[in-house]
């Protein structure tokens, strides 16, 4: 029903658009995505909270596109109703496929890709965020967010874990909450969800970055978490060699290695517990154990 409603909305706001082919992706947490004619992408927010973020995303991308040329970004436009309320967002389809769809990723870990990613992050993290704050950009990943995550882990996952694993996770979070390196940093605009699903590749070259829904003002180290977890520490270090940030790289990498680059596993396990039957939690913990021993 919602798919039909959204397609009707596209027809209402784009009456001259001839629709020959439609692809729908409803798997994301934030948007239903409709791709028309392999050419136009329409993103419909699933909640009011996500709807409120659309104008910030539009403004951010407009500013970023002025200074980033190596990597393609969505030419994002928010479509509003006659009362000025955002209905959906649209942009021209970007070529490439997400890294997550590629089985063998070693060819992606080139100096060229590392530099392209580093240049993108250097530009993003150096943006003046005060104009975006006026539009509503804030910090979601605050202390309360991480406390809530830990409580969920303790209440939901601990019963499946060994005593050593539980103690190590407690130590991981205790260090995060009490180590000054996690509070004394220079905040910047971050992407907030820079995983292998949101980085586009074509012919083994990074060509685009999408989905800025989780953009916020936070620790720039967080944006390296996906690379660390999905593509490994070595490639993350390679990116950092080309990165120009506001602080000491060793301090930033410490935060990636000892918390941000590890925490994606908890979201994965919680998601699987809720949505996947008969999965082995120790299969996930094997990778966790390996990363913690590095």
Please give the residue ranges for each predicted region:
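Short beta-strand segments
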Residues: 43-45, 77-78, 189-192, 209-210, ...
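Short, surface-exposed alpha-helical segments at coil->helix boundaries
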Residues: 3-7, 58, 237-240
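Active-site acidic catalytic loop and adjacent metal/ATP-binding pocket
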Residues: 32-35, 42, 171-222
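Short helix-capping segments at alpha-helix termini
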Residues: 66-70, 164, 246-249
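Short glycine/proline-enriched coil/turn segments at helix->beta-strand junctions
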Residues: 18-19, 36-40, 69, 203-204, ...
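An alpha-helical support segment within catalytic cores of ATP-dependent transferases
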Residues: 3-17, 109, 114-115, 126-192, ...
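ATP-binding pocket architecture of kinase catalytic cores
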Residues: 21-144, 184
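Helix-rich C-terminal or lid/interface subdomains of diverse kinases
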Residues: 29, 115-116, 214, 225-294
């Amino acid at each position: 029903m919602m798919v039909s409603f959204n397609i009707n909305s596209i027809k209402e706001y784009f009456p001259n658009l001839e629709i020959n082919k439609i692809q729908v992706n409803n798997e994301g947490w934030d948007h239903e995505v409709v791709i028309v004619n392999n050419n136009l992408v329409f993103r419909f927010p699933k909640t009011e909270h996500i709807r409120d973020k659309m104008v910030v995303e539009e403004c951010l991308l407009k500013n970023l596109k002025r200074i980033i040329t190596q990597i393609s970004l969505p030419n994002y436009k928010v479509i509003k109703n006659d009362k000025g309320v955002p209905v959906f967002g649209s942009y021209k389809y970007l070529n490439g496929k997400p890294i997550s769809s590629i089985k063998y990723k070693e060819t992606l870990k080139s100096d060229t890709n590392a530099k392209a990613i580093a240049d993108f992050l250097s530009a993003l993290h150096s943006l003046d965020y005060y104009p975006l704050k006026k539009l509503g950009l804030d910090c979601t990943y605050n202390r309360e967010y991480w406390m809530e995550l830990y409580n969920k882990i303790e209440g939901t996952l601990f019963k499946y874990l060994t005593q050593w694993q539980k103690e190590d996770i407690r130590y991981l979070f205790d260090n995060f909450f009490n180590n000054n390196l996690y509070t004394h940093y220079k905040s910047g605009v971050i992407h907030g969800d820079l995983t292998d699903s949101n980085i586009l590749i074509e012919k083994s070259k990074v060509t685009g970055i999408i989905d800025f829904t989780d953009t916020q003002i936070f620790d720039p180290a967080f944006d390296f978490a996906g690379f660390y977890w999905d593509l490994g520490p070595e490639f993350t270090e390679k990116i950092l060699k080309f990165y120009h940030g506001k602080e000491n790289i060793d301090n930033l990498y410490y935060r990636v290695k000892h918390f941000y680059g590890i925490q994606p596993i908890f979201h994965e396990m919680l998601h699987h517990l809720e949505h996947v039957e008969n999965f082995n939690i120790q299969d996930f913990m094997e990778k966790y154990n390996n990363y913690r021993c590095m």
